[in-house]
Amino acid sequence: IVADKVGYANELQLDRQGQHLYLNETFGRCLTRFNINRFGELSAPTVVTEFGAGTFPDGLAMDVEEHLWVTSPVSNRVIRVAPDGAQTLILEDSDPDHLAAVEVAYKGGSMGRVHFEEAKSQKLRNISSLAFGGPDLRTAYLGSLLGDGIASFRSPIMGRPPTHWHFNV
């Protein structure tokens, strides 16, 4: 992505019409939308939503209702974000003490790799991506930084088919 003043660009998604690009800013702790002009240039960055303590947006997927699904590796959260920025927590597997320590490090400017690698949880191991799959696109698969498997859960909303499934050259 070619844009200024981005707080560590991570995953991105295009809207269905190809007019907007959504970007997770991990250390900016926000989801930003850019307009895309007819030449493919980005403009008018707008913060769709900001995330609070413990949420460092990483993975990004879109469902058929044009809501965005955000993963956060430090807190093992999956958050569904509506087009107006409203957030719904879908799942979380985190340790409050660890999140408090990470928040102190983040605000003090000393947050580093160790804060991602030492996340404490019951089952999930630093979820970093989400993809919808299965015959009805209602199985949400979770990739992780430290796990040795792929967790999944049934989604109440169907995921949007990836653009490349219907891309013609």
Predicted regions and their residues:
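Blade-level signature of beta-propeller repeat domains, shared across WD40, Kelch, NHL, RCC1
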Residues: 124-169
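Structural signal for beta-propeller blades
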Residues: 29-32, 76-79, 148-151
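Glycine- and Gly-Pro-enriched alpha-helical subdomains that act as flexible
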Residues: 13-34, 38, 42
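Short loop/turn segments immediately following the C-termini of beta-strands
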Residues: 26, 36, 73, 135, ...
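Short loop/turn segments immediately following beta-strands, especially the blade-tip
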Residues: 34-41, 83-89, 93-95, 154-164
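Predominantly a core beta-strand signature of beta-propeller blades
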Residues: 1, 44-47, 86-88
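Beta-rich, blade/repeat-based domains predominating
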Residues: 1-20, 50-69, 75, 99-101, ...
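Internal, charge-rich low-complexity segments
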Residues: 78, 84-108
